[in-house]
Structure formats: C-alpha cells, structure tokens
Amino acid sequence: MEEIKNILIDFCKVNFKTDCDWYHWEINEDVLPKGIELPKGKNVNKNVSLKEQLHSKWSQSDIKIKGELIEYYIVQWGGIKSNNKETLTFYKTKPAEELINLGVKGVSSWSKALVLHDSNKYAIFDSRVSCSLNYLQIINESNNKILFPILPSRNNKISSANKYLKQISKNWVKLKNDKFYELYLSLLNETAKDLNTNISMIEMLLFAKATELIDKV
C-alpha cells in the first residue's frame, strides 16, 4: 500500500496547488434538507460544507430524520435511484459495521450513508474513485499494482476503462471483498495526514479526475 500512497500524495500535491476548480459536482440548492445553508463560491467548498452539516444534523436527529438525510444524500445529491425501498431502508438504518460488511455490493450507496455517520472518518467509494486509483497505478508504472474493486458505471468512458482494467489486471493484487473499504480509508487517512488535509478533499479529487486519468493511458 506504500507505493500507491506515495503516488496518491504526489497526485494530490499537484492538484491542490490549483484553486480546486476541478470539482464540478453541482448541488441542487432548491432541495436541500431543512436547516442546511451552503457557502457561496466553489463547488468543492460547498460539497465539503454539505457533508459536514449533514453529519452534524444526522448525529443530533432521531431515527426518522437520520433516514431522511441519508436518503437525500444517496438519491437526491448522489442521483442513485436504482435502490428498492427495502435496500434503501437497510442503508438508512444499519450501523457502519453492517454496511461495510456488505463489501462491494451497493458500496456507491452505502458509503454515502457512512459519510453522514462521520464525514471525517468515512468517504464515498464509487466507480470513478475506483477507476482513478487503478489508473494512477498504470500511469505511474507501479511495480506492485493493487486492484481496487471495478464497479459498474453509467458513464461510457468509465465502462470502457473498466473493460480494459479487467483485461490487464489479472496479475494485480486483489483486495478482499470485506477488507477493501477499510484499506481504502486507511490510504485516504495516511495521505490526508501527510498533506494536512481531510479525506473528503482526496476522495473528491479522485472522483473529479477519473476521465482525465483514463485519457492518459
């Protein structure tokens, strides 16, 4: 994990020198949960603030409001509308340990739920984040490549990149289904500590740069 950590640190250093205009995920401020007010300015700052405020509100709310906040973050903010009612209820009500034990299944959704549990401890893991972590190792010609789970995507470029990854990664180290998320968090935390930043900034950078990294291979 040391090699990918050093690659990620260098990648972050280059991009954090800019004004962070690389993050373009816009928030529909017309459907924000009650009591949430976002700062003016860049999307990256708005999204960090949203995570922090949602976590604060979640931690002080009853189970009904907790569930509503998680559903907002998965469905409205995240745009994931494919979960059935039963699955969404599971994500809304179960503790972190049970969600993490799901492994790859539904990780793009349940990792969003975990951000509300604690935005400083947990981070989103989705197809773009995974793709960036894998492609950074290709670009930097890593000697000991670690395959982060390849997740389905609605984005054509990500889907094509995933097909290529499956072809070339047969000899990569495969992360166990019940361990990859904790290793991912460990990687983010060690990187964040070295850079004196937070794990949200690193996750958002990985999300934002996925298609750009694909184009470099």
Set out the residue ranges of the language-model regions.
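Short Cys/His-based metal-binding microdomains
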Residues: 123
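Helix-hairpin-helix
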Residues: 94-118
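Non-catalytic, well-ordered alpha-helical scaffold segments
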Residues: 67-72, 111, 127, 200, ...
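Generic structural signal for hydrophobic core residues of well-folded globular domains
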Residues: 74-82, 113-120, 133-136, 191, ...
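C-terminal accessory module of base-excision DNA glycosylases/AP lyases that mediates lesion recognition
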Residues: 1-30, 126-132, 136-217
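Long, highly charged, low-complexity intrinsically disordered interaction regions
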Residues: 2-99
